[in-house]
Amino acid sequence: MEISTTQISIILLIALIPAFFSLKLGKELYK
């Protein structure tokens, strides 16, 4: 099975977007 760069970038986006939002929410909560 061949992994293309587009698949890698999609996986990274899917992984990073929730982490980014949880960081933003955490900063808002701990003000």
Curated annotation (Swiss-Prot):
Keyword Secreted assigned: no
What keywords are assigned to this protein? Chloroplast, Membrane, Photosynthesis, Photosystem I, Plastid, Thylakoid, Transmembrane, Transmembrane helix
Membrane topology, as annotated, equals: Single-pass membrane protein
Family matches, as SUPFAM superfamilies: Subunit XII of photosystem I reaction centre, PsaM
GO CC, alphabetical: chloroplast thylakoid membrane; photosystem I
Task: Report TM segments.
Answer: 7-26
Subcellular localization, per the record? Plastid, Chloroplast thylakoid membrane
GO aspect biological process, one term: photosynthesis
Q: What is its main location?
A: plastid
Give the top-rank taxon of the lineage listed in the UniProt record for this protein: Eukaryota
Cysteines engaged in disulfide bonds, as pairs:
none
Xref: HAMAP family = PSI_PsaM
| Family indicated by similarity | Belongs to the PsaM family.
Q: What is this protein called?
A: Photosystem I reaction center subunit XII
